[in-house]
């Protein structure tokens, strides 16, 4: 199981933009009910995909500039990056298998 990395403006380039692996960024906030409900699903995704991908989280309350830059309007938003570019987005509560399939499509 790979660890889920907290991303900030300071480490975004290193963790996401220049990463060779497919990277998923979970844009979330602590007050968002669906975000909280997705936490165990995201943990299961980490366990299922292991080191094949990099899984990250951005707390939009603490990192509003990242949310604004990527035009995040609805939480949670799962942005799938490949070669530093967003290749897919999933929004809202998403079943594990659907989120896993979306990520695996870019491996």
Language-model features: locations:
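Conserved redox-active cysteine motifs that mediate thiol-disulfide chemistry
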Residues: 27-41
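Non-catalytic, surface beta->alpha helical segment in thiol-disulfide oxidoreductase systems
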Residues: 74, 80-107
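Conserved acidic residues
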Residues: 8, 59-61
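N-terminal targeting signals for export/organelle localization
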Residues: 1-4, 44, 48, 100
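CheY-like receiver
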Residues: 14-15, 66, 102
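A short beta-strand-turn-helix
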Residues: 4-23
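Structural micro-motif
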Residues: 64, 70-79
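Conserved helix-turn-beta segment immediately C-terminal to the redox Cys motif
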Residues: 20-22, 39-58
């Amino acid at each position: 199981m790979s660890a889920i990395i907290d991303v900030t403006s300071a480490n975004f380039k290193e963790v996401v933009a220049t990463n060779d692996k497919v990277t998923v960024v979970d844009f979330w906030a602590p007050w968002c009910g669906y975000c909280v409900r997705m936490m165990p699903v995201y943990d299961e995704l980490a366990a299922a995909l292991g080191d094949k991908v990099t899984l990250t989280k951005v707390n939009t309350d603490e990192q509003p500039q990242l949310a604004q830059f990527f035009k995040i309007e609805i939480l949670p938003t799962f942005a799938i990056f490949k070669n530093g570019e967003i290749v897919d987005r999933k929004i809202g509560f998403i079943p594990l298998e659907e989120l896993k399939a979306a990520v695996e499509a870019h491996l």
